[in-house]
């Protein structure tokens, strides 16, 4: 997809969402109920979802469903996957499964890291010890509903915002222990499914490498078709893109 595309989104595929839109527009948390769909999210699906923060560049705050801001990205990892990036290439599990736009990912290795600004090179969890970046990242387990993880410093850094969003309480790391409110956490069981989203232009995409995983509740549906496309520069319709299938 390119700028100027107008796309159709298939909501019944995953099941349409039902929630109080007026409450969501006020910036308040809402319960989301999803109708039964006829398919699940799969790797390489192009998804439309609500951005997980109130502002584009404020992903140091707590997660929330931004009902006014929609993103379109490729899903490269689903619940149960372990994702890692080596030499810029997205890999699943033991590395036998590649994910995303590989040709775009290969171009990352052509750039000298010294010439890339830190805020574009280093990724979550933005930690001086867990020093992940756009070339070397992970392993990062993508949790599903009822999956459990042990709580340690690394998992605290990786999953803190998810836990806060699910529980509505702050999570702290103190004296080598993790606390949810005043309660010590030895482990955590997730309440939802999560997905890793990536832009096809890997070098210039702001995606799950930076702002983290997307809860299933935030997903609107699958992008399926370019209905029409108009150049912002000329105002003319790009007829070669009209009714083009999104892949």
Question: Residue spans of the language-model regions?
Answer:
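Soluble "head" domains of membrane/secretory-pathway proteins
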Residues: 2-247
């Amino acid at each position: 997809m390119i700028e100027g595309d107008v796309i159709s989104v298939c909501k019944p595929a995953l099941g349409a969402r039902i929630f109080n839109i007026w409450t969501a527009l006020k910036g308040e948390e809402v319960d989301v109920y999803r109708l039964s769909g006829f398919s699940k999210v799969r790797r390489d699906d192009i998804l439309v979802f609500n951005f997980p923060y109130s502002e584009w560049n404020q992903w140091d705050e707590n997660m929330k469903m931004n009902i006014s801001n929609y993103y379109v990205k490729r899903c490269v990892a689903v619940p149960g996957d372990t994702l890692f990036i080596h030499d810029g290439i997205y890999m699943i599990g033991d590395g036998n499964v590649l994910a995303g736009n590989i040709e775009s990912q290969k171009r990352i290795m052509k750039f000298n890291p010294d010439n890339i600004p830190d805020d574009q090179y280093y990724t979550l969890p933005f930690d001086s010890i867990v020093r992940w970046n756009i070339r070397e990242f992970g392993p990062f387990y993508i949790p599903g509903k009822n999956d459990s993880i042990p709580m340690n410093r690394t998992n605290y850094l990786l999953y803190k915002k998810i836990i806060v969003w699910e529980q509505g309480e702050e999570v702290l790391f103190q004296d080598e222990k993790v606390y949810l409110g005043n309660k010590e956490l030895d482990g955590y069981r997730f309440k939802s499914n999560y997905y890793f989203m990536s832009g096809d232009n890997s070098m210039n995409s702001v995606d799950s490498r930076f702002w983290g995983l997307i809860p299933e509740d935030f997903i609107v549906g699958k992008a399926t078709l370019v209905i029409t496309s108009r150049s912002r520069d000329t105002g003319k319709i790009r007829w070669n893109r009209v009714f083009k299938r999104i892949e």
